[in-house]
Amino acid sequence: MTSNKIKVLCVDDSALIRDLMSKIIDSQPDMEVVATAPDPLVARDLIKRTNPDVLTLDVEMPRMDGLDFLERLMRLRPMPVLMVSSLTQKGSEITLRALELGAVDFVAKPEMGIREGMLEYTEMIADMIRAAARSRPRAVAKQPPAKDKAPLKAPLLSSEKVIIIGASTGGTEAIRHVLEPLPANSPAVLITQHMPGGFTKSFAERLDKLCRISVKEAVDGERVLPGHAYIAPGDWHMKLARSGANYVIRLDDAPPVNRHRPSVDVLFHSAAQSAGRNAIGVILTGMGRDGAAGLLEMRQAGSYTLAQDEESCVVFGMPREAIVAGAAIDTIALSEIPAALMKRAEASGRAQRV
Protein backbone atom coordinates (compact mmCIF):
# COMPACT_ATOMS: atom_id res chain seq x y z
CA MET A 1 0.00 0.00 0.00
CA THR A 2 1.45 3.36 -1.03
CA SER A 3 1.00 6.55 0.94
CA ASN A 4 1.15 10.15 -0.25
CA LYS A 5 2.18 11.28 3.21
CA ILE A 6 5.51 13.02 3.75
CA LYS A 7 7.82 10.40 5.28
CA VAL A 8 9.96 11.75 8.13
CA LEU A 9 12.92 10.18 9.93
CA CYS A 10 13.72 11.78 13.31
CA VAL A 11 17.31 11.59 14.58
CA ASP A 12 17.90 12.75 18.16
CA ASP A 13 19.76 11.32 21.14
CA SER A 14 16.94 12.53 23.43
CA ALA A 15 14.10 10.00 23.74
CA LEU A 16 11.86 12.89 24.82
CA ILE A 17 12.51 14.88 21.63
CA ARG A 18 12.05 11.77 19.46
CA ASP A 19 8.71 11.15 21.18
CA LEU A 20 7.58 14.78 20.89
CA MET A 21 8.57 15.07 17.22
CA SER A 22 6.71 11.82 16.51
CA LYS A 23 3.58 13.14 18.26
CA ILE A 24 3.74 16.46 16.39
CA ILE A 25 4.33 14.91 12.97
CA ASP A 26 1.87 12.03 13.35
CA SER A 27 -0.85 14.51 14.41
CA GLN A 28 -0.79 15.96 10.89
CA PRO A 29 -2.89 14.31 8.15
CA ASP A 30 -0.24 14.72 5.45
CA MET A 31 2.90 13.40 7.18
CA GLU A 32 4.16 10.49 9.25
CA VAL A 33 7.26 9.40 11.15
CA VAL A 34 8.57 6.28 9.42
CA ALA A 35 11.39 5.73 11.95
CA THR A 36 13.40 7.33 14.74
CA ALA A 37 17.10 6.98 15.53
CA PRO A 38 19.16 7.86 18.62
CA ASP A 39 22.28 8.68 16.60
CA PRO A 40 23.51 9.15 13.01
CA LEU A 41 24.97 5.65 12.72
CA VAL A 42 21.55 4.07 13.30
CA ALA A 43 20.02 6.73 11.04
CA ARG A 44 22.34 5.82 8.18
CA ASP A 45 20.85 2.31 7.96
CA LEU A 46 17.29 3.59 8.44
CA ILE A 47 17.66 6.05 5.56
CA LYS A 48 18.44 3.13 3.24
CA ARG A 49 15.52 1.07 4.57
CA THR A 50 12.80 3.74 4.84
CA ASN A 51 13.79 6.25 2.11
CA PRO A 52 12.41 9.28 4.01
CA ASP A 53 11.37 12.53 2.32
CA VAL A 54 12.63 14.68 5.20
CA LEU A 55 15.17 14.12 7.98
CA THR A 56 15.04 15.95 11.32
CA LEU A 57 18.51 15.99 12.86
CA ASP A 58 19.74 17.01 16.30
CA VAL A 59 22.72 19.35 16.09
CA GLU A 60 24.78 17.83 18.91
CA MET A 61 24.85 14.04 19.34
CA PRO A 62 27.12 11.23 20.57
CA ARG A 63 28.86 8.61 18.37
CA MET A 64 28.92 10.87 15.32
CA ASP A 65 28.70 14.65 15.29
CA GLY A 66 25.54 15.97 13.61
CA LEU A 67 27.59 18.26 11.36
CA ASP A 68 29.89 15.45 10.20
CA PHE A 69 26.86 13.33 9.39
CA LEU A 70 25.14 16.19 7.57
CA GLU A 71 28.22 16.94 5.49
CA ARG A 72 28.52 13.29 4.40
CA LEU A 73 24.78 13.02 3.76
CA MET A 74 24.66 16.13 1.56
CA ARG A 75 27.66 14.92 -0.40
CA LEU A 76 26.45 11.34 -0.94
CA ARG A 77 22.65 11.57 -0.80
CA PRO A 78 21.36 15.17 -0.74
CA MET A 79 17.95 15.32 0.94
CA PRO A 80 15.87 17.87 2.88
CA VAL A 81 17.17 18.17 6.46
CA LEU A 82 15.54 20.13 9.29
CA MET A 83 17.97 20.77 12.16
CA VAL A 84 16.84 20.68 15.81
CA SER A 85 19.02 23.02 17.84
CA SER A 86 19.54 24.34 21.36
CA LEU A 87 19.23 28.06 22.07
CA THR A 88 22.86 28.43 23.11
CA GLN A 89 25.74 30.37 21.58
CA LYS A 90 27.42 27.10 20.61
CA GLY A 91 24.12 25.70 19.33
CA SER A 92 23.47 28.77 17.16
CA GLU A 93 26.96 28.67 15.63
CA ILE A 94 26.66 24.96 14.82
CA THR A 95 23.19 25.52 13.35
CA LEU A 96 24.46 28.26 11.04
CA ARG A 97 27.21 25.93 9.87
CA ALA A 98 24.55 23.25 9.23
CA LEU A 99 22.56 25.69 7.08
CA GLU A 100 25.77 26.45 5.18
CA LEU A 101 26.22 22.70 4.58
CA GLY A 102 22.75 22.43 3.05
CA ALA A 103 20.19 21.99 5.85
CA VAL A 104 16.89 23.59 4.83
CA ASP A 105 15.87 25.14 8.16
CA PHE A 106 16.02 24.65 11.92
CA VAL A 107 13.83 24.39 15.00
CA ALA A 108 15.18 25.89 18.24
CA LYS A 109 14.34 23.76 21.27
CA PRO A 110 12.82 25.78 24.15
CA GLU A 111 15.21 26.33 27.06
CA MET A 112 12.51 25.65 29.67
CA GLY A 113 9.44 23.41 29.56
CA ILE A 114 10.58 21.43 26.53
CA ARG A 115 7.46 19.25 26.29
CA GLU A 116 4.98 22.16 26.44
CA GLY A 117 7.19 24.39 24.31
CA MET A 118 7.69 21.85 21.53
CA LEU A 119 3.98 21.04 21.39
CA GLU A 120 3.26 24.79 21.05
CA TYR A 121 5.51 24.69 17.97
CA THR A 122 3.33 22.01 16.31
CA GLU A 123 2.00 24.23 13.52
CA MET A 124 5.39 25.82 12.85
CA ILE A 125 7.22 22.47 12.75
CA ALA A 126 4.57 20.98 10.44
CA ASP A 127 4.90 23.97 8.09
CA MET A 128 8.69 23.62 8.11
CA ILE A 129 8.46 19.93 7.22
CA ARG A 130 6.04 20.68 4.36
CA ALA A 131 8.41 23.37 3.07
CA ALA A 132 11.40 21.04 3.44
CA ALA A 133 9.61 18.30 1.48
CA ARG A 134 9.08 20.77 -1.39
CA SER A 135 12.59 22.23 -1.18
CA ARG A 136 15.54 21.71 -3.47
CA PRO A 137 18.32 20.13 -1.40
CA ARG A 138 21.69 20.49 -3.00
CA ALA A 139 25.22 19.45 -2.19
CA VAL A 140 27.27 22.50 -1.28
CA ALA A 141 30.31 23.07 -3.45
CA LYS A 142 33.39 24.49 -1.76
CA GLN A 143 33.96 28.08 -2.78
CA PRO A 144 36.89 30.42 -2.14
CA PRO A 145 36.17 33.16 0.39
CA ALA A 146 34.63 36.26 -1.19
CA LYS A 147 37.57 38.35 -0.01
CA ASP A 148 39.78 36.31 -2.37
CA LYS A 149 37.62 37.30 -5.35
CA ALA A 150 37.53 40.68 -7.07
CA PRO A 151 34.74 42.79 -5.55
CA LEU A 152 31.93 44.24 -7.61
CA LYS A 153 32.50 47.81 -8.76
CA ALA A 154 31.01 50.24 -6.27
CA PRO A 155 28.33 52.50 -7.71
CA LEU A 156 28.65 56.29 -7.69
CA LEU A 157 25.83 57.39 -5.45
CA SER A 158 24.94 59.33 -2.35
CA SER A 159 24.38 57.86 1.11
CA GLU A 160 20.63 58.13 0.48
CA LYS A 161 20.51 54.80 -1.37
CA VAL A 162 19.55 51.78 0.74
CA ILE A 163 19.06 48.07 -0.04
CA ILE A 164 16.26 46.27 1.81
CA ILE A 165 16.23 42.44 1.95
CA GLY A 166 13.71 39.94 3.31
CA ALA A 167 14.13 36.15 3.57
CA SER A 168 12.99 33.04 5.41
CA THR A 169 13.65 29.33 4.74
CA GLY A 170 16.98 28.97 2.95
CA GLY A 171 17.67 32.64 3.51
CA THR A 172 20.83 32.47 5.60
CA GLU A 173 22.85 31.10 2.70
CA ALA A 174 21.03 33.25 0.12
CA ILE A 175 21.86 36.38 2.14
CA ARG A 176 25.50 35.31 2.31
CA HIS A 177 25.61 34.92 -1.48
CA VAL A 178 24.15 38.42 -1.89
CA LEU A 179 26.40 40.18 0.63
CA GLU A 180 29.77 38.51 -0.01
CA PRO A 181 30.46 40.12 -3.43
CA LEU A 182 29.39 43.64 -2.37
CA PRO A 183 32.18 46.26 -2.26
CA ALA A 184 33.18 47.84 1.05
CA ASN A 185 31.48 51.12 0.10
CA SER A 186 28.21 49.53 -1.00
CA PRO A 187 24.92 51.23 -0.11
CA ALA A 188 23.64 50.35 3.35
CA VAL A 189 21.71 47.06 3.60
CA LEU A 190 18.87 46.27 6.03
CA ILE A 191 17.90 42.60 6.37
CA THR A 192 15.01 40.80 7.99
CA GLN A 193 15.57 37.04 8.12
CA HIS A 194 13.03 34.93 10.02
CA MET A 195 15.13 33.72 12.94
CA PRO A 196 14.59 33.40 16.71
CA GLY A 197 16.39 35.50 19.29
CA GLY A 198 19.86 34.21 20.09
CA PHE A 199 20.67 33.26 16.50
CA THR A 200 20.78 36.63 14.73
CA LYS A 201 23.88 37.86 16.59
CA SER A 202 25.83 34.71 15.61
CA PHE A 203 24.48 35.06 12.05
CA ALA A 204 25.69 38.68 11.82
CA GLU A 205 29.11 37.82 13.28
CA ARG A 206 29.52 34.95 10.82
CA LEU A 207 28.69 37.19 7.85
CA ASP A 208 30.94 39.97 9.11
CA LYS A 209 33.95 37.62 8.88
CA LEU A 210 33.07 36.67 5.29
CA CYS A 211 32.11 40.04 3.77
CA ARG A 212 33.86 43.25 2.78
CA ILE A 213 31.01 45.31 4.19
CA SER A 214 30.53 45.40 7.96
CA VAL A 215 27.66 43.20 9.15
CA LYS A 216 26.07 43.57 12.58
CA GLU A 217 22.92 42.90 14.54
CA ALA A 218 20.83 46.08 14.43
CA VAL A 219 20.51 48.35 17.47
CA ASP A 220 17.55 50.66 18.07
CA GLY A 221 18.28 54.27 17.13
CA GLU A 222 21.58 53.69 15.33
CA ARG A 223 22.36 55.61 12.18
CA VAL A 224 22.31 53.67 8.91
CA LEU A 225 25.65 54.02 7.11
CA PRO A 226 26.95 52.97 3.67
CA GLY A 227 29.21 49.93 3.75
CA HIS A 228 27.20 48.38 6.56
CA ALA A 229 24.54 45.65 6.71
CA TYR A 230 22.12 45.48 9.62
CA ILE A 231 20.36 42.24 10.63
CA ALA A 232 17.02 42.49 12.45
CA PRO A 233 17.42 40.92 15.92
CA GLY A 234 15.33 37.81 16.57
CA ASP A 235 11.98 38.62 18.25
CA TRP A 236 12.13 42.31 17.22
CA HIS A 237 10.59 44.07 14.23
CA MET A 238 13.03 46.35 12.40
CA LYS A 239 12.02 49.55 10.60
CA LEU A 240 13.87 52.10 8.51
CA ALA A 241 13.13 55.62 9.78
CA ARG A 242 14.24 59.20 9.16
CA SER A 243 16.02 61.50 11.59
CA GLY A 244 16.59 64.77 9.78
CA ALA A 245 18.74 64.02 6.75
CA ASN A 246 19.79 60.60 8.06
CA TYR A 247 18.32 57.12 8.07
CA VAL A 248 18.09 55.43 11.46
CA ILE A 249 16.96 52.01 12.66
CA ARG A 250 13.91 51.56 14.85
CA LEU A 251 13.20 48.29 16.68
CA ASP A 252 9.96 47.36 18.40
CA ASP A 253 8.32 44.32 19.97
CA ALA A 254 4.83 44.87 18.54
CA PRO A 255 2.81 41.67 17.91
CA PRO A 256 3.99 39.32 15.14
CA VAL A 257 2.92 40.14 11.58
CA ASN A 258 2.18 37.17 9.29
CA ARG A 259 3.07 35.05 12.35
CA HIS A 260 6.61 36.48 12.33
CA ARG A 261 8.66 38.82 14.46
CA PRO A 262 10.76 40.15 12.86
CA SER A 263 8.46 40.52 9.86
CA VAL A 264 9.62 41.30 6.33
CA ASP A 265 6.42 43.25 5.64
CA VAL A 266 7.16 45.58 8.57
CA LEU A 267 10.62 46.38 7.17
CA PHE A 268 9.43 46.78 3.57
CA HIS A 269 6.51 49.02 4.63
CA SER A 270 8.88 51.30 6.55
CA ALA A 271 11.28 51.48 3.59
CA ALA A 272 8.43 52.48 1.27
CA GLN A 273 7.54 55.32 3.63
CA SER A 274 11.04 56.49 4.57
CA ALA A 275 13.08 55.88 1.42
CA GLY A 276 10.66 55.50 -1.51
CA ARG A 277 12.54 55.62 -4.80
CA ASN A 278 15.89 55.65 -2.98
CA ALA A 279 15.30 52.07 -1.81
CA ILE A 280 15.91 48.77 -3.58
CA GLY A 281 13.72 45.91 -2.31
CA VAL A 282 14.76 42.26 -2.55
CA ILE A 283 12.70 39.22 -1.56
CA LEU A 284 14.61 35.96 -1.26
CA THR A 285 13.80 32.29 -0.67
CA GLY A 286 11.28 31.46 2.05
CA MET A 287 7.95 29.85 2.86
CA GLY A 288 4.72 31.78 3.29
CA ARG A 289 3.72 35.23 2.09
CA ASP A 290 5.53 37.61 4.45
CA GLY A 291 6.97 40.47 2.41
CA ALA A 292 4.67 40.33 -0.63
CA ALA A 293 2.42 43.21 0.48
CA GLY A 294 5.37 45.28 1.70
CA LEU A 295 7.34 44.80 -1.52
CA LEU A 296 4.29 45.94 -3.49
CA GLU A 297 4.17 49.08 -1.32
CA MET A 298 7.84 49.67 -2.09
CA ARG A 299 7.22 49.34 -5.82
CA GLN A 300 4.26 51.72 -5.62
CA ALA A 301 6.47 54.21 -3.73
CA GLY A 302 8.98 54.18 -6.59
CA SER A 303 11.47 51.61 -5.30
CA TYR A 304 13.16 49.15 -7.64
CA THR A 305 12.07 45.67 -6.54
CA LEU A 306 13.21 42.18 -7.40
CA ALA A 307 12.47 38.59 -6.42
CA GLN A 308 14.73 35.54 -6.42
CA ASP A 309 13.76 33.10 -9.17
CA GLU A 310 12.26 29.67 -8.52
CA GLU A 311 15.23 27.69 -9.79
CA SER A 312 17.67 29.19 -7.27
CA CYS A 313 15.28 29.22 -4.28
CA VAL A 314 15.36 26.56 -1.57
CA VAL A 315 11.63 27.27 -1.06
CA PHE A 316 9.80 29.35 -3.69
CA GLY A 317 7.08 30.67 -1.37
CA MET A 318 7.67 34.32 -0.47
CA PRO A 319 9.10 35.27 -3.90
CA ARG A 320 6.20 33.55 -5.68
CA GLU A 321 3.64 35.45 -3.57
CA ALA A 322 5.42 38.73 -4.33
CA ILE A 323 5.50 37.97 -8.06
CA VAL A 324 1.79 37.01 -8.10
CA ALA A 325 0.98 40.27 -6.27
CA GLY A 326 2.80 42.27 -8.95
CA ALA A 327 5.35 43.47 -6.40
CA ALA A 328 8.55 42.45 -8.23
CA ILE A 329 9.79 44.45 -11.20
CA ASP A 330 12.37 41.76 -12.01
CA THR A 331 12.83 38.07 -11.15
CA ILE A 332 16.42 36.85 -11.32
CA ALA A 333 18.73 34.05 -10.17
CA LEU A 334 20.44 34.39 -6.79
CA SER A 335 23.90 34.49 -8.40
CA GLU A 336 22.90 37.55 -10.46
CA ILE A 337 21.40 39.60 -7.61
CA PRO A 338 24.59 41.29 -6.25
CA ALA A 339 25.59 42.66 -9.68
CA ALA A 340 21.98 43.69 -10.37
CA LEU A 341 21.90 45.65 -7.10
CA MET A 342 25.09 47.58 -7.90
CA LYS A 343 24.03 48.19 -11.50
CA ARG A 344 20.62 49.42 -10.39
CA ALA A 345 22.07 51.66 -7.69
CA GLU A 346 24.37 53.29 -10.25
CA ALA A 347 21.71 53.51 -12.97
CA SER A 348 19.49 55.53 -10.66
CA GLY A 349 22.23 58.14 -10.42
CA ARG A 350 22.50 60.46 -7.47
CA ALA A 351 19.67 59.60 -5.11
CA GLN A 352 16.77 61.97 -4.76
CA ARG A 353 15.85 63.16 -1.31
CA VAL A 354 12.41 62.05 -0.21
Swiss-Prot record:
Q: What is its main location?
A: cytoplasm
Concerning SUPFAM superfamilies, the annotation shows: CheY-like, Methylesterase CheB, C-terminal domain
GO (cellular component) term, any one: cytoplasm
Name the active site residues: S168, H194, D290
Q: Where is the Response regulatory domain?
A: 7-124
| EC numbers on record | 3.1.1.61, 3.5.1.44
The record's listing under CDD domains reads:
CheB_Rec (cd16432), REC_CheB-like (cd17541)
Family, per entry: Belongs to the CheB family.
As for what it does, the entry says: Involved in chemotaxis. Part of a chemotaxis signal transduction system that modulates chemotaxis in response to various stimuli. Catalyzes the demethylation of specific methylglutamate residues introduced into the chemoreceptors (methyl-accepting chemotaxis proteins or MCP) by CheR. Also mediates the irreversible deamidation of specific glutamine residues to glutamic acid.
What is the protein named?
Answer: Protein-glutamate methylesterase/protein-glutamine glutaminase
Q: Which organism is it from?
A: Chromohalobacter salexigens (strain ATCC BAA-138 / DSM 3043 / CIP 106854 / NCIMB 13768 / 1H11)
